[in-house]
Structure formats: structure tokens, C-alpha cells
Amino acid sequence: MFSRKKRELMKTPSISKKNRAGSPNPQSSSGELPRKDWTEAPGLEPPATSLSTVAKGTGTLKRPTSLSRHASAAGFPLSGTATWTLVRGYRSPLSAASPAELPTEGAFPDGVEDISTLLADVARFAEGLEKLKECVLQDDLLEARRPLAHECLGEALRVMRQVISRYPLLNTVETLTAAGTLIAKVKAFHYECNNESDKREFEKALETIAVSFSCTVSEFLLGEVDSSTLLAVPPGDPSQSMENLYGAGTEGPPHNVEECEEGCLPPEEVDMLLQRCEGGVDAALQYAKDMARYMKDLISYLEKRTTLEMEFAKGLQKVVHNCRQSVTHEPHMPLLSIYSLALEQDLEFGHGMVQAAGTLQTQTFMQPLTLRRLEHERRRKEIKESWHRAQRKLQEAEANLRKAKQGYKQRCEDHDKARLQVAKAEEEQQGTGPGAGTAASKALDKRRRLEEEAKNKAEEAMATYRTCVADAKTQKQELEDTKVTALRQIQEVIRQSDQTIKSATISYYQLMHMQTAPLPVNFQMLCESSKLYDPGQQYASHVRQLQRGEEPDVRYDFEPYVSNNSWSPIMRTRKGSFNPGDASGPEAAGSPPEEGGTSEAAPNKDHRGGRGHQVHKSWPISISDTEVGLDTSSGDLKKFDRTSSSGTMSSSEELGDQEAGLVASAFDSADLNGMDPELPVAMPSGPFRHVGLSKAARTHRLRKLRTPAKCRECNSYVYFQGAECEECCLACHKKCLETLAIQCGHKKLQGRLQLFGQDFSQAALSTPDGVPFIVKKCVCEIERRALHTKGIYRVNGVKTRVEKLCQAFENGKELVELSQASPHDISNVLKLYLRQLPEPLISFRFYHELVGLAKDSLKAEAEAKAASRGRQGGSESEAATLAMVGRLRELMQDLPAENRATLLYLLKHLRRIVEMEQDNKMTPGNLGIVFGPTLLRPRPTDATVSLSSLVDYPHQARVIETLIVHYGLVFEEEPEEAPGSQEGASTQCGQLESAEGIVFPLQEEAEDGSRESHAASNDSDSELEDASDPLSSSDASALHRLSFLEQTEAGLEEGPQSHSGSEEQLEGEDGAPGPWLCHFNTNQSNNTSRAPLPTMRLRGGQITGGTSQERQPQFV
């Protein structure tokens, strides 16, 4: 049965993939559904499987609303969601509403065992169908066949349901439509008599489900499952069937269906009617136009309705989140479980509605209908244009025909006149005498010539007229052909749009029904559950769970007065104050160890905690000249003079806060009993101690702002709730203290600096080495914590944060704190600074020569690749690269000193970025693309973006890539500086020669991935430490070694902020002690310049240098 050809299936009404192409959610059409709603057979009972269990396996599938109730009775999972019950097992059916979100578990067979299991299930299903066929078609036991057939049908469908629940991708439209048809045929079969038509229809339905299921399994095993055939999520009504789409359950088909079929004309008759009537094409085009407007109105209506529903769902979710905690806070409240479940249901309903709105917008309604409308309009305009073109051709032919007809008549009249004149001339010649014959003959000849010309013109006009008549007939026929074609195309477009509207409408109302169908059930369930509650039940439960002892029996007796003279309240209290068990307050905290006892450590610790909380309160204002402190050695209180602050006098409240901070620090520094405190760090004091301060804000001594000033963080004026630093006079909003990025410089902060867009030569004057502070600051922070960040310099930062960081640099200069900023924001600031320079780092005058070098290099590389294709070797490409590197070295030497120093500093940093290429994914090529237009750009012109600059982007990137890769060759004579050193500290790392001229081999790759430089910055408390890597030799080519020249530097670990000559000893190549580092150092007293390194040369793939005798100290 499963081996028959699928073409036999074409005899039965089915859904082809071609018809489903225009539908976003293909549904079964009316021609494929059974037309009768027969009564249920008593022998087909629903299985014991609960709906929630069924939904657990197929909760993410979509199914049509038309699945038969008998499929449900046979075990088909009809609902994508569990029925609302008292257990909270409801899940939103839209959790996987699209085929792309189907569950991965069980989607495809994992191995041979799963395929074997699937094939075994298919065999069981085939056996069930064979049994069903034998049971239905047997000739004996006519009346007893009905319950037996229903039992066989249920068994076969249960097997099918198990397969579909295990492999959800088998749940297709064709399979379940065929199942519904088979169920209808089994119900409608007349078992009392052998009707041949019933047998043929039953066999056809059986063949249909067999072929459909086998084809679906085959496509599933081959991985060719069409996602468009997956079913939509059905409503949760298990009684819904395919027959219910036609109305109530009557014995025959409803009358409205028959009337609809009688009134519906075939497409050919519709076209014939429009062809025969006048203006048929125009009427069809107008209908198509109205239909496009109708689709637009539908989309607008559904969009507004969906927006309202989404707002309602979000508002409902917000109400549930706000009220759930307060409602469920107290246990044992009446009907608490009911309202808890109602809250859960409302939350799930809100989630479902939000997801349903998203599905409507992107999958099922708005997007498909919008695309269909656009396509509908495009096709309508094309058909309209072709129809109007054919009409214009016919009109032109008719106009030509009228002109030709008029000309033909005129020529014929002229010919008749000419003939009459000739006849008249002949008569006159015959009536005259022989003496006048010469003049008459001449006139006669002339009139004959005119008559001949008129005749020729009449014949030409007749020919033209006949041609125009033929052309008009041709154009008329072409217009008729165009009319037929246009009507057929218009009807096709309209039917496609109808199908899209139908599918979208079915999907929409199915989705809405699925969302709203559980609501009445939920409310009814909550109502019935509420009826079961007995008043006072929860109160009794609450009282029963109280863990209280029995109330003691209290007796009231008279006690006579007894006098005791030795008793004294004062002595009693004073004695109790030294009791270590009852000690509390300052007396207990200040008691000496011998009185308080050392065994009571835990109580004393508790009392210290209470005391520590109290000392943060402001002291009384009456204490003006002295402050109360603690002597950490004896625990006694003493008085000391208050030190005056460097700023203006603070208010009394600030004085109290400062005194409280001092006492708190005294209490925190040592315990009263001589023990270490628990919390060594004191709480922040002052008027802003309760505000979350940033790292930079904690470096300021803040007080309340007295006069209006401009906030250095947000660049707006501060009038109220402002803070001011006593030392640097920085003003800031109270709320801006949480994000303040400017540290305290312990001197008055200067005014705002125009940093971005400033001339580079002016910016470089502020630093001794010519590298602007913003470049050092950003590079140091990136190397400290962002060398491994993926996409550094390629990923842009957040625009608002970048603007605030730029503003902080202009306000605070080198005092900006970057430890809390995003690495991408910092890199964006650096790129923005370099990009906004009036003249780029590589001057304008080098642009054309550098671009020419890049062009020549790319051309030589392409020629070398073409020449070396099919053979080994790349010497020509290496030679071209070496030539370009040599020319780059010469050009870079002509750069201004500050530009060269900054470029050298930046390229060293980019080399460290490249060393971490495996982590940050930033190759030299990527960095060249990022920094090419930034460091190298042409002189600006009147045009916004010139075409040449766009063409030169690859060449700019090539130049920067070459500078990064061959950095060691281009800048081989440059000394190595530690990034971030702003005082010119002599941290010369990477010397390649020893005192006796020892040759160090080149290093191919860093062993531990990267080598970060040391930073001793006077404007930031962050330091970068050198990671020393041992030198290693390799056998690679000389060019590749030279491209990693800077990796050959020996790691010399130097203490931070070293201001004296180092006495460390270098290690030689073979592990033996090398020369002392002091031989390479210059005099450090008042020395702010560096001695240049000796010249390095390439000999046999190794770097050699001069001896230490060639190096002389330089004094400044």
C-alpha cells in the first residue's frame, strides 16, 4: 500500500505545495474537507491520556482549527497548551509558534536506533490500516462491523499520534487532513449494506492517508521537510472538528454551502462575462484597486487593535507584578490559592498576548498581507499599463483610418471632377471649327493629364485606406487578445490576494481563539473552586499552625511590705553597670579588660558594633575648639586641636560630620579593649556620605556648594543640591557624583580646554616627549584591561558615553579616571581625537606618495602571485615589500618630531593589540582599515567626501597595515618607551645588545601571548607592569623576522617610578650573567630626555648592535 505512486493521490482533493506558496500559514481549503457532520459512533471512546500530557509533547506545534473530534478521541494531540487546571501547568502556546522555533529534542532521529524505532512505528501504523481495511470491507457480520471498525481506527490513529508526538516535524497539513477524511469516511460508511460507492471512497481515503504519511516520513528521513506544511497551533477546544467549519452537526451538508457553490462561477465564465460587457477590464482593474485599498484598511485596523491589546497585556503584567507580592505575602488568607492562580493566569495571558501580537506583526497577518498588497499593486499597475498601451494603439489606428478614409473620399471627388472636365473639353473641341483645333487640343491634353494625376492619387488614397483598415483590424484583434490576457491576469492576482487574505484571517482568528478560548474555562474553574471554600477555613488552619505554649496560670496574692534599709537603688545600678553580662552603652564599651573580663568576647563584639554605628552621627555643635578622640593604647578619651582645612570654613553641619568621621576612624583604628576592629575601612563622612560616589569622586573632599557654578560632569549650571571640592574647587551636581570621572588634583582645577580639533603641535607642547596626554591615557587603559577584548577599535562605543568622556577630558585633562569606562568608549575617544585633528598624524604632504607606494605594493603583490601560481616561492613579493618598507622608513624620518613620537607610540600599542589577535580578532589588516582614514587622509576639499578619498581607502589601510606589520623595520632606530610614562622615566625595555656586543636572536612569537608595557603615570593610580618574555630564535625567513622586530626586546623588569639607576643584571643568551643594566642607563638627576639606542643591523636573520663602549651618557 505504501509503495504506490503518489500520482494516484491527485485523484483526491488535497493541498499541493504550489497552492500553498502564497499563504503564510497554509490551511486546508473547503474542497478538501468532508461535507457531512455525522453523529459520533458509540464505540469510539476517548483514551485515558490527559490533555496536559498530550500537550507536553506537542506544545510547540501548530495545527488547524479543523481537526476532527474523532482524531481527538483516537488520541491525537489537539491542543498546543495544557488545559487550565488547578495545577499551574499552563504554558503559552506561542512559545514556539513558528517552524523556526520547533523543539530540537526529538526533531530528527539521532541515530540508527531512532530510525529503527521510527520504521517500526510506521510498520505498526501500516498494520493498523490493513486491519481497518479488512474490518470495514468484510462481507459478514454487517451490523457488528461498526464498533470493530471504530476500534481498529482508534488503534491506527493512536500509533500515528505517538509517532507525531515523538517527531513533531511529521505533523503536516496533508497527513492530518487525510486523517480527518478517513475518520469521516469510517463514520459515514453504511455497514448495513454493501454500497460500492462507500467502498471506493473508503479505499481512496485509506490510500490518501497511507501515501501522505509515507511521503512525509520519507522527506523527514531525507531532511527535506517543508516548513510551510507545518500546522498552526489549534485552539484548546477538543470538540472542534473539520466538519464544524460548515456549521452545526446535521445529516446532510448545509444549504448555504450548496447555494454558495451554485452562485460561484468558474474562472472561465467570469472572464467571458467581462469580455462580453463594455468596460470589463476597467471594472476588473477598479475592483483590484479597491481590493488593495481594502487590504490597507485591514492592516491598519489590525495594527491598531493589536497595539491596544499589547498595551492591555503589558498593563496587566505590570499590575500582576506589582500586586502579586503583596497578595501572596501573608499565608492562610481566604481564597489565597484561587487568587494566586488567577494572578498566574493573568501573567500567562499577558505573555501570550504579547507573543501573539509579535507573531501577528511578523509572521501570520501584517507582514504577509503587506507584502501581498505591494505585489498586488505592482501587478495591477503592470496590467493596467499593458491594457492602456493596447488601447492607445487601437486609438491611433482608428485615427489613421479616419484620416485615410477622408483623404480617399477627397481624392475620388477630385478624380470625378477631372473626368467631367475632360469630357466637357472633348465636347467643346468637337463643337468648334477646324481653325481652333490647336488651342482646344492643348487644353484637352492638359485636362487629360490632370485627370490621370487625380486617378493616380485616388488609387494611392484607396491603398492607404485599405492599409489603415487592415491595421485597425489588427489592433482591434490585439486589443481583444490583451483584454483576455489582462482579465485572466487580474483574476489570478485577485485570487492570490484572496488566498492570502483568507490564510491570514484564518491564522489571525485561530490565534485569537487560541488566546481567548482558555479564559472562560479558567473563570469557570476558579468559580467552581471558590464554591468549595468554607468560610473560616484558612483562619482555622492559621490558628492550628501557631506554635505557642499554653498560657501560664497567673495568681494574684497580697504581699505585705517588708522594709530593708541596706538596699540602695544607686548602689544597685552602679554595681550592675560593671556586670559583664549586663554591660551596655559607653560604660561597657570603655570598661578595661580586667573589669569587663576577656571571656565575654562575643557580647563585647556586639556592643562594639552598636557603638560603631553611633559614632557616625554628628557630634553636638557645642564642641567647637577641640574634638574628642581615642587613645588607642589606653582606651581613654582625650582632646586635641582641630586642624584647619585648606579651603573655606565649613558650616556647623559639615563640622559635625567631619568630627563624626574622625571619631569613627578612631574607633575603627583600634578597639577599646586593644583588639583590632572588624571593619578597617571607615564609612564615608560628610554631607554626601549617603550618595553612591564613583571612584574618581571619592578622591575629592566634598562640601556643599554655596554659589552657582557649572557642573564639570554634565556641563550644566548647578544651583541647588550641588557639591564642591575644597581642594580643586570642582563643582558637580549631587546626582553626577555617581558618574564623575575627574579625579582631584589637589590644586585649583583649570578652565575647560579645547582639546578635540586643536592643532596637534599645540597639544604636544604640554608633554616632554611630544605625545598628547589623551593618547597616553587611552592607550594605557586599553592595554591594562582590554588587550583581549574582542573587536577592540572595531566596535564603536555608546555615543552618549563617548561624548561625556570627551567632555571629561576637556574639563579634567589628565585627571580623568578611566577604570570604570567601557573599553570600546575609550577606543572611540582615541579614534575621535585623532580623526578631528586639523592635520592628520601623517601630514598631508606625505599622502600622495604613501598612497602611490601602497598602489605599487598591491600591484607588485598581484603580479608576484600571478607569476608564482603553481610554483613555490615569494621572493618577488618580499622584495616589493622590502622596497616599500625602505621608502616608508625614509618618509617617516621626515615627519615632525611630535608627530613621529606619537605615531611610534601608537604603532607600538597596535602591535600589542595584534599580538592578542587570537582573542581580540583584530589583525593588522583590520587595524589598517580602522586607522587608515584616521591617520592618513588627503587635504580637505570643498566636496564633503571626494571620490578619490573613497577609492584610496584600501591604499590607506595598506599603508597602516604595513607600518604595523613591519614596525621594526620602519622604526628600527627608535628607543622603546613604556606606554603611559609622562615624566620620561627611563624604563628602556628591550635592549638587543649587551656590553660585549652579544647578538640576541629574533623572537618569532611571544610565549604567553602579549607583553604589556609598564606605566608610571602621575595622573592616574593605575599601573601597567611589564611581562618579560624570554628571547627565542627561529628559522623563519628574514622578512618575517623583521616584521616582528619589536618582539625581540629583552624583558627588563623595573620597579614602578624608579628615579635611580637600576642595579639589575641582564641574563645572557646562554643563561650566563650578562652586563649590568646600569651600563645602559644615563644620569638620572634632572634628566628628562632619553639617550638614543645604538644602531641595530640585520645579519643572517639576527639583530646585532654595538658594544657598551660606544654608548655615552647624556646630561641635560
UniProtKB/Swiss-Prot annotation:
It is found in: Cytoplasm; Cell projection, Ruffle membrane. The keyword Zinc-finger applies. Its main location: cytoplasm. InterPro entries: AH/BAR_dom_sf, C1-like_sf, F_BAR, FCH_dom, GMIP/FCHO2-like_FCH, PE/DAG-bd, RHG29_45_N, Rho_GTPase_activation_prot. Residues 22-31, 621-635, 1080-1090, 1105-1116 have a biased composition (Polar residues). GO terms for cellular component: cytoplasm; ruffle membrane. The keyword DNA damage does not apply. GO terms for biological process: regulation of small GTPase mediated signal transduction; signal transduction. This is Rho GTPase-activating protein 45. It comes from Mus musculus (Mouse).
